[in-house]
Amino acid sequence: MKDALDFAAINQAALAAFPAVLNRLLPGGKAIGGEIVALNPRRADRRLGSFRVNRYNGRWADFATGDKGGDPISLVAYLGNISQGEAARMLARMLGIETEGRRRG
């Protein structure tokens, strides 16, 4: 049986390391004010401007397509076209957070 994922803890850890996380997820992104503006790797994006991620709270949006989300896990899920659970596990691995197989006692 798999352990329950602590989405809140994973999101909190991701936000604490968000500059490095964003660098890895969106290489070439540019800091503009409190946001990272990057090309959207999910579409044939040729210009910076419409895909933005808030560096402090993790909210993100692609204003050209209407896609948006509220936290780092949803960003990873969107970019990888994967489920929220898969995204949480991927982000946890990236951050060195153990999510499964914990032994107690």
Predicted regions and their residues:
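N-terminal structured subdomain of primase-like DNA metabolism proteins
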Residues: M1-G105
